[in-house]
Regions:
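Extended alpha-helical scaffolding segments
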Residues: 1-193, 214-460
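Flanking scaffold residues of small Cys/His-coordinated metal-binding clusters
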Residues: 201-202
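Cys/His-enriched microdomains
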Residues: 205
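Short Cys/His-rich metal-coordination motifs, predominantly Zn2+-binding knuckles/fingers
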Residues: 210-212
Length: 460
């Protein structure tokens, strides 16, 4: 089973508990199928009859917003493909009549379907009034209501017309105010509606990830990699250049077909893992997990004797993956993967391994036991930095390519019992033997750490 299949399995396990749920300490929630995360600048409150109540600017620390998306809107560039619900002012204001018309038509189709609800009806009714810019100006959210200022003036470094609006709906009967970007009902209704749409609009065929005959897609998610926002993991829709041409097939569909739902689950799951639990090493990002949702001890970080939780990231990881190390068995696969943005639009899988859970834990214990009598075990980050890094401005810096290569090398040593290379040992011993050449005389801590790594990994 490959990476995308493992991600689909993980999504199926985690979605019921975490999809659409905002959790303190997390950078972002797990996006449900047919949803994406964007930054909202404006929050508008209307009642269930579509009457304006209030508006406010969204603080930057609270702006991550789950919004319904279509295949076209999620992959749009300059063409007018509106999001179905939360949208930018240029689609809502009426200054661009064509964009507003396409937004309202799409929203009406959802509202009039079996999956429409009070939220879709209220927003459609309100936007149709064409008063949103005036209301925002009166509420002092915008400094101007003139059309020419929509491109000139900015809010949070974003031009007015590009500001994303999210909706709060107040029930006129109960007075309850619903934040639609957190509403399970909204998620459920849109997923059901868009499944109906995709079944009509998309070609049905074999999904090579699940083995099922389902609606297929050639458009896949971007913005899944924190170090390069536009990079795609599955990206080639080019049928004229260097893609599948020259292989044993003549058509792209003969080489790879992926179901819409499988694509959504795998990409949303990968984004969630990378953004919340990813570990940056040079120009790559590593992530590790168990597809059954069990806790996995870190193969990267250092431990001190008696220390249980060593970082905020580890604390969050333990709270989400609720299990104990003892529960990992031979049937629990541990996945470790590293990703690298090759260009602004392309994401590569740079490292991938699968290890049985019981073997994974045993190898970590064996690595720990190899540090005889040690109260502190250096992390593979530290070993790499002190072996191949140089001190600059009182910091140990290492070239990105070397750093990631040595991290991967040490992972193989730690998890698969490979011997540590002589070149790495020699680098450590050389640094430890020449402290005045390798380290600034005031950086006693750096030298001590290097010496400790050398003693532990290069015994006489």
């Amino acid at each position: 089973m490959g990476l995308l299949q493992k991600l689909i399995k993980t999504y199926d396990v985690m979605a019921d508990k975490y999809a659409g749920v905002y959790i303190d300490g997390m950078r972002e929630p797990l996006a449900p199928v047919s949803h994406a995360l964007q930054n909202a600048q404006i929050e508008i409150t209307i009642d269930s009859n579509g009457c304006f109540i209030d508006a406010a600017a969204v603080p930057k620390k609270e702006n991550r917003t789950l919004i319904p998306v279509s295949l076209k809107s999620a992959n749009r560039t300059s063409h007018a493909s509106p999001h179905p619900f939360a949208e930018q002012l240029e689609y809502l204001s009426g200054f661009d009549e064509e964009r507003q018309k396409s937004y309202l038509e799409q929203l009406m189709d959802w509202d009039e379907s079996a999956y429409g609800n009070v939220f879709t009806h209220a927003v459609h009714t309100y936007v149709e009034k064409n008063s949103i810019i005036h209301d925002l100006y009166k509420a002092e959210v915008l400094e101007s209501e003139n059309e020419e200022d929509m491109s000139k003036k900015k809010m949070q470094s974003t031009a007015y017309k590009k500001c994303l609006v999210r909706w709060k709906i107040k029930d006129v009967l109960t007075g309850e105010v619903i934040e639609t970007w957190k509403s399970k009902e909204m998620f459920r209704c849109y997923i059901a509606y868009y499944n109906m749409v995709i079944a009509k609009e998309s070609k049905t065929g074999l999904c090579m990830l699940t083995g099922e005959n389902v609606p297929l897609t050639e458009l896949h998610a971007k913005n899944i990699f924190p170090l390069q926002s536009g990079a795609k993991l599955v990206s080639a829709n080019d049928k004229t250049e260097y893609t599948f041409r020259g292989t044993f097939v003549k058509n792209a569909e003969d080489l790879l077909t992926i179901g819409y739902e499988a694509s959504q689950k795998s990409h949303n799951m990968l984004r969630w893992l990378l953004n919340n639990f990813g570990i940056i090493a040079g120009n790559e990002m590593f992530v590790y997990w168990n597809p059954n949702g069990r806790y996995v001890p870190s193969p990267f970080e250092d431990r001190k004797e008696g220390e249980e939780i060593i970082s905020d990231r580890e604390t969050l990881y333990r709270s989400i993956f609720e299990s104990t190390e003892d529960s990992l068995s031979s049937t629990d696969c541990i996945v470790i993967a590293a990703f690298k943005a090759m260009t602004t639009g392309r994401l590569a899988l740079a490292y991938y391994s699968e290890t049985p859970g019981n073997d994974f834990v045993a190898k970590l214990e064996k690595w720990k036991e190899s540090f005889t009598g040690a109260k502190w075990i250096p992390s593979i980050y530290m070993v790499s930095k002190y072996a191949y890094g140089s001190e600059r401005n009182e910091r140990i810096e290492i070239e990105s390519g070397i750093y990631t290569k040595k991290i991967e090398e040490l992972l193989w040593c730690k998890l698969y019992g490979h011997p540590i290379s002589e070149s790495l040992k020699n680098a450590l011993v050389t640094k430890a033997s020449s402290p005045y050449r390798a380290f600034h005389y005031r950086q006693q801590c750096s030298y001590n750490n290097c010496l400790w790594c050398s003693i532990q990994l290069c015994p006489l």
